[in-house]
Amino acid sequence: MLVLGAFCAEAQHYDRGYETVPSSPFMPKGTWAAGGSMKYTQHINDNFSLMVINGINSTGYNVSVHPKVIYHFRENMGVGLRFSYDRSMLDLASAEISVADITMGAKDCYQISHKYSLHGVYRAYIPLGNAKRIAMFADVLLGGSFKQGKTFNAGGTYAAGTYTTAGVLELAVDPGMIAFLTDRLALELNVGIFGVNYSWTNQTHNQVDMGYTDSTSAGFMVNLLSIGVGLSYYFL
C-alpha cells in the first residue's frame, strides 16, 4: 500500500502580549490634543561655597515653555506641531576656585541666551490592555532650532564680549508613555533615544574676530537631558 502525504507550511501569528488593534481604539480618529510643559527656576548665591568653588555671588534664571498640538487623522495615529522656547541668564559677580596652592577667580561675568524650536510630529500609540487608560507611544520629530546668546566679561584688564548664533536641523525618535488621569486629561512621559542632526555655530568676539563650527551626529543613545514630563488635554 502506497501512502501519499501532503504537507503544507502556514505562517502563524505570534502574540507578543499586547493588542495593537483593539475592538475600540485607544485614540479615536478626529481627536485633537493640546498640551505641553513649562518650567521656571531661579537662583541667588550670596558668598556660597560648593566643593572647590568658594565665594560664589551670582543670580540667574531658566525659563522653558514647550506647547504642542496633535490631530489624530486615524485611530491611534496623529500628526501635529511642537514649539519650544528656552531662555537662561547668569550674572556672576565673583567666584574663586581653589585646588591645593592654585587659586583662580572670575568676576563681573554675564551670560544670556534664548532658543526657539519648531518640529513636526508624527505619533503612533500602542495600547496596554483594554482599559484605555495607559499606552505606549512613539513620536517621530522633524524640525530644527535657532539660538542667540551673548557673554560679557568685565573682570579682566579689558572688557570682552562674544555674540553667538547657532542652529540645529534634526530627525529624532522619542518613545514614551501616556496615562489618563481623567477622561480627557493625560500625563505624558517621553525620552529621546535616536537622533540624526546637523548643527552649526557662529561667533563674533569683541565685534572683530569671527568664529565658526559645525557638526553632524547620528545614533542610538538615551538622552537623559531630553526626558520630558507634561500634561495634555484631549478633545474626544
Question: How would you describe each model-predicted region?
Answer:
Residues 11-71, 223-236:
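Short glycine/proline- and aromatic-enriched beta-strand/turn motifs that initiate or cap beta-hairpins
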Residues 50-55, 102-111, 156-163, 213-219:
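Extracellular loop and loop/strand-boundary signature of outer-membrane beta-barrel proteins
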Residues 38-42, 68-156, 222-236:
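Gram-negative (and chloroplast) outer-membrane scaffold detector with strong preference
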Residues 129, 133-189, 193:
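A charged, solvent-exposed segment within the mature domains of Sec-exported extracytoplasmic proteins
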Residues 30-32, 59-65, 112-118, 134, ...:
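Residues that define the transmembrane beta-barrel architecture of outer-membrane proteins
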Residues 20-25, 55, 65, 82-85, ...:
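Transmembrane beta-barrel domains of bacterial outer-membrane proteins
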Residues 2-10:
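Hydrophobic h-region of N-terminal signal peptides that target proteins for export
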Residues 88-90, 176-236:
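Predominantly the C-terminal beta-signal and adjacent terminal strand-loop region
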